[in-house]
C-alpha cells in the first residue's frame, strides 16, 4: 500500500511539473560557463568535458541548465563508474551538444520520451519528457542515440546559435 501511495505521489508531482512548464525566455547564452555550472554539481572526475571552445546558443539559460543536469545525471546513473562525456560544436547556425555515457544502451527507445515511462526503480518517468519539451520550446531538438563506438547512449541536443 505504501509503495502504491509513493508511486501515485510521484505520478501526481510529475504531471504537475509537465503541466506548468514556464514559457522559455531565450537570449544569447555562453555555453561553456553554463556547462561548467552543470558539471560542478557532480564529481569532477565523473564528467569529461571534451570541448574547450565557447559558443553562444539562443536559449533560456535556466531551462537549458536543467536539461544539462538531467541528462548528465541520467548518464552517470546508467554508466556506473564510467565517466560521462560532454561536448559541443557549432555549424551552419546550429549548436550541437552531446552527452555520452557507457551504460547498457537503449532498452526500449520507442518509449523513452513517453510521459511516466521509466526504466529506473523509483523513477517518475518525466525527466526526458521535460527535457525534450524544454528544448523543443526553444526551437531545438533532443534525441537519444546508441553509441557507435561501444555500449552506451549519446544524448544530442541541437539549438539555434546566437
Feature roles, as predicted:
Residues 106-116:
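Short conserved segment of the HATPase_c
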Residues 74-79:
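Short helix-loop "hinge" at the ATP-lid/N-box region of the Bergerat-fold HATPase_c
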Residues 135-136:
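Detector for a conserved hydrophobic position within an alpha-helical segment of the HATPase_c
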Residues 1-29, 33-44:
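Conserved DHp (HisKA) dimerization/phosphotransfer helix of two-component histidine kinases, i.e.
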Residues 127, 131:
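Short alpha-helical Gxxx[C/S/T] motif in the catalytic ATP-binding
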Residues 48-56, 62, 91:
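Conserved catalytic submotifs in the C-terminal HATPase_c
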Residues 83-93:
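Short beta-strand/loop element within the Bergerat-fold HATPase_c
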